[in-house]
Curated annotation (Swiss-Prot):
Family annotation (InterPro entries): Cbl-indep_Met_Synth_N (IPR013215), Cobalamin-indep_Met_synthase (IPR006276), Met_Synth_C/arc (IPR002629), UROD/MetE-like_sf (IPR038071)
Binding site for L-homocysteine: I460, G461, S462, E513, D628
Function according to Swiss-Prot or TrEMBL: Catalyzes the transfer of a methyl group from 5-methyltetrahydrofolate to homocysteine resulting in methionine formation.
Keywords: Amino-acid biosynthesis, Metal-binding, Methionine biosynthesis, Methyltransferase, Repeat, Transferase, Zinc
Protein name: 5-methyltetrahydropteroyltriglutamate--homocysteine methyltransferase
Catalytic activity: 5-methyltetrahydropteroyltri-L-glutamate + L-homocysteine = tetrahydropteroyltri-L-glutamate + L-methionine
GO MF annotation, one: zinc ion binding
Protein source organism: Acidithiobacillus ferrooxidans (strain ATCC 23270 / DSM 14882 / CIP 104768 / NCIMB 8455)
Length: 784
C-alpha cells in the first residue's frame, strides 16, 4: 500500500509557543525543566496532528530548540574548543552559547539553508578532530513518539551534507581568538580559502564521523525503529566529484545487518545527475523533490531497483498555494504504475518553511483563503493523493473537485492582473536601470553635499523594538489606539532614537523604524497585489520568526510608504538622515510569491514600486537612501549553470529601483548573512554608492575577495554581530577595521553593525554603539 509521510513539521507552534518559551528561558523567567516540558508538549501536539492527517510515518528529530544543524553538531560532539566542552552530554548552556554567543565567546557563524530564508549554525571543523555521540535528544524523542503508539521515522542530516555545509577552522587562530577576541584568517572553505589560512580538507573527516552515524543507526535499530530518513540536500548542489564518490563509500560503510531501513532524502533541486549512484546505494529508498524538479523523475524510473521505495514530493513544502491535485496525480501515474506500493507520497521538503495551519486565518477573505495551503493542509493534500492512488480517484472525488475549483478560481480572478502595471513593464523595454553618471562623479557630488568624516559611522536601520512599541502597534491594529495617537507614539520613539544617535556621534543617523513590524511585511501591507496573514509565521533562526506576505497579483504602490516618517526624522537633526527601504529582490525572496508567472517579472513590478518611493523621498529632502537587499544571494539557483540569468535580472531590478536618484543622492544597500565572494561582479553591477555587509561572524572573511577584486564603490563591513547579546570591545572592532583597511582603501570604508538592531535591547545596543563610535575615532586617528 502506498505510504504517505512528512519530511518534517514546523517547530514553532500554532501560537509561537516555542519562541515564547525560549525567550522566557533566556531571560530566566523559566528554568530548563519548564523549557523542556513546553518543548515536549509541542512535539506531542505536532505528532498527533500528523497522525490525524493520515501520515503513516511521523518525523522525529525535526524539532529543535534552535536549529537542526546545531542539533547534529551536538549529537556528533562537534563542539568548538572555545566553548569549553569537557565531554559527556552537551548541555543547554553550551548549546545556546554556540548559537547565540556568551559573555566571553562569540556565536558560531550562521548562514542560509540552501536558497531558503531559514538560517543554520555552520559546523566548525579542525584538523584531527574527533567525533563522539554526545546527545540523547534523538533517542529520547523516539521514546516519546513510541509512547504515543505512533510509527517513528527519525530524521538525520546526512554525513555528506553535514560536512559540506561546515567550515574548516585553524585551531591556532582560535587560540589567538580566545586571547584577543578575534580570528586571524581562521576559516577556510571548500570554495576558496582566505589568504593566509591554514587549511585542510574537511572531507578527510568522513571516516571519523561515520562511526558515530553507525552508532546512532544501531541504537535506533535496538529501539525498534524501522525507517530512518537521512537528508542529503547537498546532492542538489554542484558537488565536486570526490564528494559524490564519498557519498557512495559513506553509505556502503553505514550498511549493517541490524540497522533501520534508510530513506535518503534529497530536495530543493534536481539530483538527476546522481541518479545512477543513488539507485546503486545500499539504502531502502530515495526521496525526490518533484515540485522544484519534476523533470528528474524519468532518470529514476528508468531501471529503478526492485528492492527500493521511491518517495516523491509533489506538494510544495516551500510555498503556500493550494496544490493542483489533478496535476500531481497525473505526474505520479507513471511511477505508480511501475512501482505500486513502493511509491511513497510526501511534501517536496520539510514543512519548516511554511506556516502551521490555515484554519487560524479567520480574517482572510474566502476567495484568497481558498487558494492557500499551510503545513496542516499540505499533509491533508498528501493524504488525499495517497488515497487516490490506493483506493482510486472516486474515493476522493469531492476533495479533488474542491481543489480543482480553487485552481480555476485563482487563474480567472480579476484580482490577479493590473493592465497599468503591465504597461509600465512594457515601457521599460531594454532599459537596464543605469544611473545618470558613473560612480566617481556621483561620489564627488555626494562628498561635496554631506562632508562626512573618514570612516563615517551609521547603523543598518532598525533600533530596538521595545514592548511599548509593540503594544502601541497592537493597540492601533485593534482600534484601541487612534491613528493620531499612534503617530505621536511613533514620533516620540523616533525622536528618542535620533537624539541618542546625536549623543553617540553617529554620522549618518536613521529613524529607527519603530513603525515597522517587519522589513518586508511593512512594505507589502502598503503595496497592491499583496495579502497578509495574522498567524502565517515561519522560522528564520532560533526564536526569530517572520510572517511573509503573500504576493498573489500584480504589484504597484498606491501611496507613499515611508516618506512622512523619514521627513519627520530629518527635521530633528542637521545630520543627513538615511531613508530606509527594502529592495525588490528581498521583498520577493521573503514573500510567498505567486507561481503563475516568472519570478523575474514580479521582481521588476516591485522595483518600479520602490522607484516611486525613492522619487518621493528625494522630493522630501532625503539625500541618503538605503535599499536593503540582504536576500540577494539567497535567490541564487543552487546550480551554477543557472546563476547568470538570475544575477542579470536581480541586479537590474535593484538598479531600476534606484535609477531615479540624482548624482548627489547617495544610494546604500545592505546584505547580511551573505557569502558573495564568488558573485562580486554582479554585486558591483548593482552600482550602489555604499554597500554594508555582514562580516563580523566570519571575522571579515567576506572581504578577502576584495584583495583581488577591485570593488569600485564604498563599503561598510559590519564590525559587530547583532545576533548575539554580547557587547564587543573597542579593541575588537578596531582590529576588524584594521583587517578591512588591508584590502579596501581607507577612504572607501564605513563603520557599522552587521545588521539592524531590532531584536536587541537598549542595554546591549547603547554600549555597543558607544564602542563602535570610539573605534571609529581611533581608526580615523590612525588612518584618517
Amino acid at each position: 500500500m502506498t505510504s504517505v509521510h512528512s519530511l518534517g513539521f514546523p517547530r514553532i507552534g500554532h501560537k509561537r509557543e516555542l519562541k515564547k518559551a525560549l525567550e522566557s528561558f533566556w531571560s530566566r523567567e523559566i528554568d530548563e525543566q519548564e523549557l523542556q516540558s513546553r518543548a515536549a508538549q509541542l512535539r506531542d501536539r505536532h505528532w498527533r496532528i500528523q497522525q490525524t492527517c493520515g501520515m503513516d510515518l511521523v518525523p522525529v528529530g525535526d524539532f529543535s530548540l534552535y536549529d537542526h544543524m546545531l542539533d547534529m553538531s551536538c549529537t556528533l560532539g562537534a563542539i568548538p574548543p572555545r566553548y569549553g566542552f569537557a565531554g559527556g552530554q552537551v548541555g543547554l548552556d553550551t548549546f545556546f552559547a554556540m548559537a547565540r554567543g556568551s559573555a566571553t565567546q562569540p556565536a558560531m557563524e550562521m548562514t542560509k539553508w540552501f536558497d531558503t530564508n531559514y538560517h543554520f549554525i555552520v559546523p566548525e571543523f579542525h584538523e584531527g578532530m574527533d567525533f563522539r555521540l554526545s546527545s540523547e535528544r534523538l533517542f529520547d524523542q523516539v521514546k516519546e513518539v513510541q509512547a504515543l503508539g505512533l510509527k517513528a521515522k527519525p530524521v538525520l542530516v546526512g554525513p555528506i551534507t553535514y560536512l559540506w555545509l561546515g567550515k574548516e577552522k585553524d585551531l591556532n587562530a582560535e587560540a589567538h581568538h580566545d586571547a584577543q577576541h578575534h580570528h586571524d584568517d581562521s576559516a577556510c572553505h571548500g570554495h576558496g580559502a582566505p589568504i593566509g589560512a591554514a587549511c585542510f580538507d574537511r572531507l578527510t573527516l568522513l571516516p571519523k564521523v561515520l562511526p558515530v552515524y553507525a552508532e546512532i543507526l544501531a541504537r535506533l535499530a535496538e529501539m525498534g525503529v524501522e525507517w530512518v530518513q537521512i537528508d542529503e540536500p547537498a546532492l542538489a548542489l554542484d558537488l565536486p566529484q570526490e564528494w559524490v564518490e564519498a557519498l557512495e563509500s559513506a553509505y556502503q560503510t553505514l550498511r549493517r545487518d541490524k540497522t533501520p531501513k534508510v530513506l535518503l532524502a534529497t530536495y530543493f533541486d534536481s539530483v538527476a545527475d546522481h541518479a545512477k549512484a543513488l539507485k546503486a546505494l545500499p539504502v531502502a529508498g530515495v526521496h525526490l523533490d518533484l515540485r522544484r524538479a519534476p523533470q528528474q523523475l524519468n532518470s529514476f524510473l528508468s531501471d529503478y531497483p526492485a528492492d527500493k521505495v521511491l518517495s516523491l514530493g509533489v506538494v510544495d513544502g516551500r510555498n503556500v498555494w493550494r496544490a493542483d491535485l489533478d496535476a500531481a496525480l497525473e505526474l505520479l501515474q507513471p511511477a505508480h504504475k511501475q512501482l505500486g506500493d513502493r511509491l511513497w507520497v510526501a511534501p517536496s521538503c520539510s514543512l519548516l518553511h511554511t506556516p502551521v495551519d490555515l484554519e487560524q486565518e479567520t480574517e482572510l477573505d474566502a476567495e484568497l483563503k481558498s487558494w492557500l495551503s499551510f503545513s496542516v493542509q499540505k499533509l491533508d493534500e498528501v493524504a488525499i493523493i495517497g488515497r487516490a492512488l490506493k483506493e482510486g480517484v472516486e474515493s476522493v472525488a469531492q476533495e479533488l473537485a474542491a481543489a480543482r475549483a480553487a485552481v480555476a478560481s485563482r487563474k480567472s480572478s480579476p484580482r490577479i492582473h493590473n493592465p497599468a502595471v503591465a504597461q509600465r513593464l512594457e515601457g521599460l523595454g531594454q532599459d537596464d536601470g543605469r544611473r545618470k553618471s558613473p560612480f566617481p562623479i556621483r561620489e564627488a557630488a555626494q562628498r561635496a553635499r554631506f562632508k562626512l568624516p573618514a570612516f563615517p559611522t551609521t547603523s543598518i536601520g532598525s533600533f530596538p523594538q521595545t514592548p511599548e512599541i509593540r503594544k502601541a502597534r497592537l493597540q492601533n491594529r485593534k482600534g484601541e489606539l487612534s491613528n493620531a495617537d499612534y503617530q505621536k507614539a511613533m514620533e516620540a520613539e523616533i525622536a528618542l532614537v535620533v537624539k541618542e544617535q546625536e549623543r553617540l556621534g553617529i554620522d549618518v543617523p536613521v529613524h529607527g523604524e519603530p513603525e515597522r513590524n517587519d522589513m518586508v511585511e511593512y512594505f507589502g501591507e502598503q503595496l497592491a497585489g499583496f495579502a497578509f496573514t495574522r498567524h502565517g509565521w515561519v522560522q528564520s533562526y532560533g526564536s526569530r520568526y517572520v510572517k511573509p506576505p503573500l504576493i498573489f497579483g500584480d504589484v504597484s504602490r498606491p501611496t507613499p510608504m515611508t516618506v512622512a516618517w523619514s521627513k519627520y526624522a530629518q527635521s530633528l537633526t542637521q545630520r543627513p538622515m538615511k531613508g530606509m527601504l527594502t529592495g525588490p529582490v528581498t521583498i520577493l525572496q521573503w514573500s510567498f510569491v505567486r507561481d503563475d508567472q516568472p519570478r523575474e517579472r514580479t521582481a521588476l513590478q516591485i522595483a518600479l514600486a520602490i522607484r516611486d518611493e525613492v522619487r518621493d523621498l528625494i522630493d522630501a529632502g532625503i539625500g541618503i537612501i538605503q535599499i536593503d537587499e540582504p536576500a540577494y544571494r539567497e535567490g541564487l539557483p543552487l546550480k551554477r549553470k543557472d546563476w547568470g540569468h538570475y544575477l542579470e535580472w536581480a541586479s537590474r531590478a535593484f538598479r531600476i529601483s534606484a535609477q531615479i536618484a540624482p548624482d548627489d543622492v547617495q544610494i546604500h544597500t545592505h546584505m547580511c548573512y551573505s557569502e558573495f565572494n564568488d558573485i562580486l561582479p554582479a554585486i558591483a553591477a548593482m552600482d550602489a554608492d555604499v554597500i554594508t555587509i555582514e562580516t563580523s561572524r566570519s571575522q571579515m572573511e567576506l572581504l578577502d575577495a576584495f584583495a583581488t577584486f577591485n570593488y569600485p564603490n564604498e563599503i561598510g563591513p559590519g564590525v559587530y554581530d547583532i545576533h548575539s547579546p554580547r557587547v564587543p570591545s573597542v579593541e575588537e572592532m578596531v582590529g576588524l577595521m584594521e583587517k578591512a583597511v588591508k584590502v579596501v582603501p581607507a577612504e572607501r570604508l564605513w563603520i557599522n553593525p552587521d545588521c539592524g538592531l531590532k531584536t536587541r535591547k537598549w542595554a546591549e545596543v547603547t554600549p555597543a554603539l558607544e564602542n563602535m563610535v570610539e573605534a571609529a575615532r581611533q581608526v580615523r586617528a590612525r588612518h584618517g
